[in-house]
Amino acid sequence: IGGGKNSSGATNVNISGGEVNASTGYGNGGAGIGGGKESSGATNIEITGDALVSAGSSGSAAIGSGESSTGETTINIHDTNPEKGVKSAFAYGGAGIGSGRYAKGKTYVTISNASVSTLETPAASTNTSGAGIGTGYGSQSNADITITESTVKAVGGTGAAIGSGSEGDVFSPPTGDPNTFKTIIRITDSNVTASSGPSAAIGSGSYSTNATEIHINGGKIEASNYSGSAIGSGDSAKGKTGIYITGSNVTATADIGTGIGSGTSSSGETTIDISGGTVTAMGGGDGYDGSAGIGSGSHSTGYTHITLHDGVTVKATGGGDSSHGGGGGAGIGSGDRAKGNTDILIKGATKVTAKGGSTAAGIGSGNGSNGSTIINIEGGTITAEGGGKENGFCQASGAGIGSGGNALNKTTINIKGGEITATGGVSLDSRNHSDKWLSGAGIGSGSNVSGETEINISGDSTIKSASGGKYGGAGIGSGSYSGSTPDSKKGAVTINITDGTIEKATGGGEYVPSSKRWYSGAGIGAGLNAGTTTINIKDNAHIVSA
């Protein structure tokens, strides 16, 4: 239904009633409803009222523009009556609702007070490379997607469920410059369920070069994916990503990728700003690598900025179980072996609970992170636990707040307010036919860390409890075996306490019968077999118990 191949005139389709089933066959290249293949004219589609629509296509969009089209596309689905709207819209290569494969015209999709589903039957992901709602595979265009007061169920594959399509794969990566085009997604007061594969569920497709901006205000969001991010960028995406969530009820989970943030092996800069509402985010892992709950994916290289403020309640869990000897991602922070820098700001009346994946920090860096990490806590109630597992395969432990195990670059922790409870992780590494017990600090470094750590505690902060992992992590300071190299600068820890109250700082202490020794760390200072530690306590510092 709509325009023909190579058409240059505008195509206008208005559906306000009846039951419509429209699809095109393989190789046709035209939309099920909308523009024809290689058309240059504008495409305008309106679906409203008593319309019940199902559409499909191959190459083009199911509802939208044709393959390789260049005209602007505007789709408006609004004010549908109960049990009406879009029942299904699925395309191979093109978007379900949006633009066709290789399309170059700008795409506008508006869904308001409507019911929309891209698949008739539930599925976690598909094998399509176009977005469920957004742009098709290899699209070179800007896109604007607005969802208001609607119920939407969208499924993606290598293309996002809601956002941009894929632009390639490991064998044929995209050659375009990052951020040339931009996808903007606005979701307001809606009930949205989105799932995908290597792409983001809400955000960019795998190997996408598009810049992506995501605004979620109010409503309920359930997003899940495989190796991209549930909300953010896709696997190996290169574009810049901004994620802004306000007053929403959000659940974001991933099998290997990030809950909220950048996808695995992505390289674009990522900004995450979350205020108000309730957010649950879980990163994934496969035993080799884990990604952050909120932050960056494993092996990512882009800079990540995270701000949590204004009363948001957050529960974030990093991925990675170390079952194959790999590392984990932070609850909030970076993924396993991420190379990009990370800064984290928590302020206001926030409530944060964060747990690192095995070997990763609760709040801070993932295992083997090679980027610098800056953590600023200015308010809120914070509970953080470092990751670790006593399964014989876990190579390190993460700090509650600070660095993950094996971190290579500097970590700076500035605590100026809030109430903090932090616990270091505990691990057992038996991979080399001998047992090695490891622990991270409550606040400070993980185990086996060679990057420097600086801890600054001031202002009206209250450390309710800082507990090192039981095998020799410091309460505040270093994890076990951190900085235990001939180079005194590697893994060095500096602790500056100038104000605030430390109610309890406890080093880990455990007797291990098989090794016939105690594993102990300081309350404030060095962990077991750790390197250089400098402690400065002055001014109005108040230490109750250490």
Regions picked out by a protein language model, each given a short descriptive name:
Residues I1-G25, I33-G56, I63-A91, I97-S129, ...:
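Surface-exposed loop/turn motifs in large extracellular/passenger domains
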